[in-house]
């Protein structure tokens, strides 16, 4: 009987705790709303909490009270809540930017956590903008954090960017860079652009006080197959931290109208050597399609079509080969691997990635760089000629393998050998279709 009473008491207490937690959340939300209302109606002076919080930067001659008020009145949109966006948003929030918008279409994944440090294991599966908002609101409850869980497109870009003073480009694909550039030029807003790949980073400011825009320097996009993002090429988290923090710094300097803004200059960071370099960029192009006196581009266009690639870094798939030059992972598995038929499988990932995981069947590792530079093509040709076996090529996502097949096919035909074939979708397709326990990265 006593045991039943104990269980009943536990249930009552648990219900009470749930009720109290709900009430607490409601009170916290009321407090946030009240603070935001107070902040919006008190932008001409700093309160005691703000003076204490920002005192270490207010005492700088470059900032002062008036500078802090400028930061309080300012609004910044951070496009991308990843490796660059996280540190940029973090330092902007810490500095007291009054209103910060965070735009991202993605959800938090385990692969993000080594470099996107506003996200945690507890927020895996949540939208990135929700994760960032939660962190920043705990850091600084006196500022306003707006979230936009959406993919930036030609249809929504102008409306999303228009309410903000400065835009931070923390994205990882070419199409979005062109879109952001053109939208910022049309809206007359400065664009703080950063990028990070492997152990290197870059930073500049476009469309600021007569400086060049992105199109002035790059009027036409690069070939899709030549573009590498951090998902394919890799990146060290500390590199994105450095560049993202510097993006916040440039944004703050713009808001304060301070000297030294990186307009017309490109900052290069070499993480391997811990070295910074500043390069002078070409001036604003008089015939630029979007920022010249007589622009030919006066509205946003289809940037995926313009660049020949998707405006996302999520498993962007190239189609470089004819269907007869490719094979699905299912057909390869059932028709060759599981059937035990002799063949040669070539894995074109680099040695580090190859060491992480390999398909069964003892594939030969020949990195794509060694194929495209012909360093090891003779080795492959000799092996194929000696064995007289069909050759299949695999990579991580099915893009580099197509480049390899396109390069190797004419060389194979010259020796009267059947051209190699590409495994569609690469190892990602293998995990999704054949073996869900195969590592994905």
UniProtKB/Swiss-Prot annotation:
Cofactor note: Binds 1 zinc ion per subunit.
Catalytic activity of the protein: [molybdopterin-synthase sulfur-carrier protein]-C-terminal Gly-Gly + ATP + H(+) = [molybdopterin-synthase sulfur-carrier protein]-C-terminal Gly-Gly-AMP + diphosphate; [molybdopterin-synthase sulfur-carrier protein]-C-terminal Gly-Gly-AMP + S-sulfanyl-L-cysteinyl-[cysteine desulfurase] + AH2 = [molybdopterin-synthase sulfur-carrier protein]-C-terminal-Gly-aminoethanethioate + L-cysteinyl-[cysteine desulfurase] + A + AMP + 2 H(+)
Functional pathway: tRNA modification; 5-methoxycarbonylmethyl-2-thiouridine-tRNA biosynthesis; Cofactor biosynthesis; molybdopterin biosynthesis
Disulfide topology: none
Biological process, per Gene Ontology: Mo-molybdopterin cofactor biosynthetic process; protein urmylation; tRNA wobble position uridine thiolation
Binding site for ATP: 83, 104, 111-115, 128, 172-173
Any one GO MF annotation of this record: ATP binding
InterPro entries membership: MOCS3/Uba4, Rhodanese-like_dom, Rhodanese-like_dom_sf, ThiF/MoeB/HesA, ThiF_NAD_FAD-bd, Ubiquitin-activating_enz
E.C. designation(s): 2.7.7.80, 2.8.1.11
Top-level enzyme category: transferase
Name by which UniProt lists this protein: Adenylyltransferase and sulfurtransferase MOCS3
Organism ancestry: Eukaryota, Metazoa, Ecdysozoa, Arthropoda, Hexapoda
């Amino acid at each position: 009987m006593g045991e039943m009473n104990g269980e009943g008491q536990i249930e009552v207490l648990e219900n009470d705790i749930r009720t109290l937690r709900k009430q607490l959340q409601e009170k916290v939300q009321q407090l946030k709303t009240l603070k935001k209302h107070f902040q919006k109606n008190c932008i001409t002076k700093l309160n005691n909490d703000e003076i204490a919080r920002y005192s270490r930067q207010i005492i700088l001659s470059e900032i002062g009270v008036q500078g802090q008020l400028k930061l309080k009145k300012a609004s910044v949109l951070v496009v991308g809540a990843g490796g660059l966006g996280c540190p940029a948003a973090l330092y902007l929030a810490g500095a007291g930017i009054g209103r910060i918008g965070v735009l991202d279409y993605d959800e938090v994944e385990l692969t993000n956590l080594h470099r996107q440090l506003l996200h945690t294991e507890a927020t895996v599966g949540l939208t990135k903008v929700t994760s960032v908002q939660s962190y920043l609101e705990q850091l600084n409850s006196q500022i306003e954090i707006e979230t936009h869980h959406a993919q930036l497109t030609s249809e929504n870009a102008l409306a999303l960017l228009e309410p903000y003073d400065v835009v931070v480009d923390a994205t990882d694909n070419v199409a979005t860079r062109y879109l952001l550039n053109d939208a910022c030029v049309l809206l007359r807003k400065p664009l703080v652009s950063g990028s990070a790949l492997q152990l290197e980073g870059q930073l500049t400011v476009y469309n600021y006080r007569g400086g060049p825009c992105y199109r002035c320097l790059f009027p036409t996009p690069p070939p899709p197959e030549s573009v590498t993002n951090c998902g394919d090429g890799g990146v060290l988290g500390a590199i994105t931290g450095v560049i993202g923090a510097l993006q916040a710094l440039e944004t703050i300097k713009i808001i304060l109208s301070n000297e030294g803004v990186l307009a017309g200059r490109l900052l290069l960071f070499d993480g391997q050597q811990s070295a910074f370099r500043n390069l002078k960029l070409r001036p604003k192009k008089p015939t630029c399609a979007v920022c010249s006196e007589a622009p030919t581009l006066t509205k946003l266009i289809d940037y995926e079509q313009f660049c020949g690639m998707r405006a996302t870094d999520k498993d962007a798939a190239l189609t470089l080969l004819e269907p007869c030059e490719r094979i699905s992972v299912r057909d390869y598995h059932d028709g060759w691997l599981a059937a035990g038929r002799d063949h040669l499988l070539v894995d074109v990932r680099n040695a580090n990635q190859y060491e992480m995981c390999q398909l069964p069947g003892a594939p030969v590792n020949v990195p794509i760089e060694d194929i495209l530079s012909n360093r090891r093509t003779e080795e492959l040709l000799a092996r194929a000629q000696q064995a007289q076996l069909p050759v299949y090529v695999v990579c991580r996502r099915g893009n580099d393998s197509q480049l390899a097949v396109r390069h190797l096919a004419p060389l194979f035909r010259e020796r009267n050998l059947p051209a190699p074939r590409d495994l569609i979708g690469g190892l990602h397709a293998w995990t999704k279709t054949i073996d869900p326990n195969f590592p994905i990265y």
